Swiss-Prot record:
Phylogenetic placement of the source organism: Bacteria, Pseudomonadati, Pseudomonadota, Betaproteobacteria, Nitrosomonadales
The entry's keywords: Amino-acid biosynthesis, Cobalt, Diaminopimelate biosynthesis, Hydrolase, Lysine biosynthesis, Metal-binding, Zinc
Free-text remark on how the cofactor is bound: Binds 2 Zn(2+) or Co(2+) ions per subunit.
Family: Belongs to the peptidase M20A family. DapE subfamily.
Gene Ontology biological process terms in this record: diaminopimelate biosynthetic process; L-arginine biosynthetic process; lysine biosynthetic process via diaminopimelate
Organism: Methylobacillus flagellatus (strain ATCC 51484 / DSM 6875 / VKM B-1610 / KT)
Gene: dapE
Any GO molecular function: succinyl-diaminopimelate desuccinylase activity
Identification of the protein by name: Succinyl-diaminopimelate desuccinylase
Length: 375
């Protein structure tokens, strides 16, 4: 059994349902301390995090990831117990196998091999590990980044081990992510009996033309790396449940996924302008959960692309698709950041798994990237 597979199984066996770390981080720390890493355990609220660093000079390459996993769903529907890592028909099964305990294991064994070959390597290696990525993400990576930023400890290169591969491992690198801006819009009217329309103001009717305009607005055209910004409604709530009462207000929840071609402030201004033009009485609360970030082609993208080609025989595409990740926090202090990891076909699903044959090439990818950037 490879060292990476063995460590991945040890991690999967720990029931670290978010935000519980279940001892995963101490296991990782026990492998890093003998290599000369300094360890900062950073607990915020009920969340365990740590920052590890080996070296005091630049450039600093940081691996980032999370030990927490999502709940299993109906255990009886799993082919194997979700926290009993099982190798079957060439696949490693278990909750967190793809998202993202195999990546964590590959980080560690790649670093171990690199340090063994280059004990006096230039630059520094770091890790940011949290147990709060799958949950509310308020006491995890964002707080670690705030700690580093407060002392002006900046990152040159960062690799997040998210499962980015689509059809075969190595086919996709995330070199950026869209921003996420949510709104809670409450349009106010006058409640009353549905049989007396002259005595009421129906907020649903009033809001409808504005909703139509918002849904048809072209917010931007995107750019080379990002698709156009999208605006989508997720929920509409209005009414008392009775069929003879016009509601006094309607609540509309919506979300922007926006590119670097737009800013959160510009999008807010344009939404308010549309609502005001339709002469609505409304309240609007905003939540910015992540700004867009982008790493253009450069030394990090070149290094990891070459490593993937050597390890997997695949030429990766660059993509900014998908949801948000902790990369949105790290981008605030990182010069270059990418995400790369296993296939994402089974993440958050029953019978989550990775191919055993992909595990050592993943470790080799991370090791080759280290060698390209820190030799």
């Amino acid at each position: 059994m490879s060292r990476t597979l063995e460590l991945a199984k040890d991690l999967i066996a720990r029931k670290s349902v978010t935000p519980d770390d279940a001892g995963c981080q101490e296991l990782l720390i026990s492998r890093l301390e003998p290599l000369g890493f300094s360890i900062e355990r950073l607990r915020f609220g009920d969340v365990d995090n740590f920052y590890a660093r080996r070296g005091n000079t630049g450039p600093l390459l940081v691996f980032a990831g999370h030990t927490d996993v999502v709940p299993t769903g109906p255990v009886a529907q799993w082919h194997t117990p979700p926290f009993t890592p099982t190798v079957k028909d060439g696949m490693l099964y278990g909750r967190g196998a793809a998202d993202m305990k195999t990546s964590l294991a590959a980080f560690i064994t790649a670093i171990e091999a690199f340090v063994a070959d280059h004990p006096d390597h230039p630059g520094s290696i770091g890790l940011i590990i949290t147990s709060d990525e799958e949950g509310v993400a308020i006491n995890g990576t964002v707080k670690v980044v705030e700690t580093l930023k407060a002392r002006n400890e900046l990152i040159d290169y960062c690799i997040v081990g998210e499962p980015t591969s689509s059809k075969v491992v190595g086919d996709m690198i995330k070199n950026g992510r869209r921003g996420s801006l949510s709104g809670k819009l409450t349009v106010k009217g006058i409640q009353g009996h549905i049989a007396y329309p002259h005595l009421v103001k129906n907020p649903i009717h009033m809001a409808a033309p504005a909703i139509k305009e918002l849904s048809e607005t072209i917010w931007d055209e995107g750019n080379e790396y990002f698709p156009p910004t999208s605006w989508q409604i997720s929920n509409i709530h209005g009414g008392t449940g009775a069929t003879n009462v016009v509601p006094g207000e309607v609540e509309i929840l919506f979300n922007f996924r926006f590119s670097t071609a737009s800013t959160a402030e510009n999008l807010k201004q344009r939404v308010h302008a549309i609502l005001d033009r339709h002469q609505l009485e409304y309240d609007l609360a905003w939540e910015l959960s992540g700004k867009p970030f982008l790493t253009p082609r450069g030394s990090l993208v070149t290094a990891i692309s070459s490593a993937i080609d050597q390890a997997f025989g695949v030429t990766p595409a660059l993509s900014t698709s998908g949801g948000t990740s902790d990369g949105r926090f790290i981008a605030d202090i990182a010069g270059q950041i990418v995400e790369f990891g296993p296939l994402n076909a089974t993440i958050h699903k029953l019978n989550e798994c990775v191919a055993v044959a992909d595990i050592e090439p993943l470790r080799r990818t991370y090791q080759l990237t280290l060698e390209a950037l820190l030799k």
